């Protein structure tokens, strides 16, 4: 039996207005090489200046994960030769990162939590972009110098499920902190996976393989599963030393397999040394105060939702998994929606319709205010639950319409007047005398028949609670 050992390196693109070491804008939609300057192009004499906003965002992350935020950190040069790096080095942090020794807690299927250590989070500059067309290549340096925060975990994960849970928690955290849009498809949240296996009980780690630049949670799980199986088979076949090397591999989406990219470099291969153009980054009290201003994070929200709003722990996890979902839920509550009912209508009714239509919650045609009002109207018996579903369907197709107008137009206003409901009940009982006698003779299952007939005649608008109450009065009199 083998134990899987997983560590993750996540590159988060910080949502600053300008690049890490110059004042060029960070937008990529511009014409190629438009957002560049002598610093981006590594022209002689151009000197870097640290982006204060990027440092504060990294610090805010550090405080959020209970890490040590170093008041002095060092920038280093990482030497390598690629066309998308005109300086032939990357400015990063190796010797002393701005954030060290943090932690993140993931939720396991059994309801417990597991601590995942964070070795460090450091600032570094992104490279440009190579574009290959036919038999020639072009380089776009608009992206060069964009601020990245690389978050390095401890090798604390033991399965692909734990790795994905950690990634999702990390993704959620940086979005709540508003330090990155963390768009995986656009590359602003990308992951390198380090995988090894070892016989259970063995302390020494096996040979570590790195899988580069995976941009979806699903692909992370698939890549880990494939790589673990490859290493296990090599071990069992007695060819582990020959086939499993410390190397960098790529995840081939089309073939659903990892394939060798290059031998894994060690730190010495990159010839790291302190950047002579940058003084140590010194944190001021003003920067600390600004970094400590942060929103309520997912774990705190879960605790509050469970303890104060009385919703289930699982439901709280679902709602807080996305910042937009949590804010939507809270807006529903401010509109008078009961928390437990709001959970059902948000996670089942609305999300079900949005998923079917391929719409994200932030683009929902039904606002949180509107859905909150609708749920409140169910509670005060203005409309039945069944009728409210029709109203929601209508709102999905017709934005910004008044709920009361929709209820009136569709004839869905719930009838709670005793007299109106009794009139319907009396008519039904009069037309079904034989069944009334059977009910009174002991066939109590017929009660459901009378309820159904009443709801049918009222076209679903009669208050179900009132119908049950008044029917019992009539049948038992």
UniProtKB/Swiss-Prot annotation:
One of its GO terms (molecular function) is ATP binding. InterPro entries: Asn/Gln-tRNA_amidoTrfase_suB/E (IPR017959), Asn/Gln-tRNA_Trfase_suB/E_cat (IPR006075), Asn/Gln_amidotransferase (IPR018027), Asn/Gln_tRNA_amidoTrase-B-like (IPR003789), GatB (IPR004413), GatB_C_1 (IPR042114), GatB_Yqey_C_2 (IPR023168), Gln-tRNA_amidoTrfase_suB_CS (IPR017958). It catalyses: L-glutamyl-tRNA(Gln) + L-glutamine + ATP + H2O = L-glutaminyl-tRNA(Gln) + L-glutamate + ADP + phosphate + H(+); L-aspartyl-tRNA(Asn) + L-glutamine + ATP + H2O = L-asparaginyl-tRNA(Asn) + L-glutamate + ADP + phosphate + 2 H(+). Keywords: ATP-binding, Ligase, Nucleotide-binding, Protein biosynthesis. Belongs to the GatB/GatE family. GatB subfamily. NCBIfam families: gatB, PRK05477.1-2, PRK05477.1-4. The lineage of its organism: Bacteria, Pseudomonadati, Campylobacterota, Epsilonproteobacteria, Campylobacterales. This is Aspartyl/glutamyl-tRNA(Asn/Gln) amidotransferase subunit B. Heterotrimer of A, B and C subunits. SUPFAM superfamilies: GatB/YqeY motif, Glutamine synthetase/guanido kinase. It comes from the Bacteria. It holds the Pfam family GatB_N. Its EC number is 6.3.5.-. GO terms for biological process: glutaminyl-tRNAGln biosynthesis via transamidation; translation. SMART domains: GatB_Yqey. Allows the formation of correctly charged Asn-tRNA(Asn) or Gln-tRNA(Gln) through the transamidation of misacylated Asp-tRNA(Asn) or Glu-tRNA(Gln) in organisms which lack either or both of asparaginyl-tRNA or glutaminyl-tRNA synthetases. The reaction takes place in the presence of glutamine and ATP through an activated phospho-Asp-tRNA(Asn) or phospho-Glu-tRNA(Gln). HAMAP family: GatB (MF_00121).
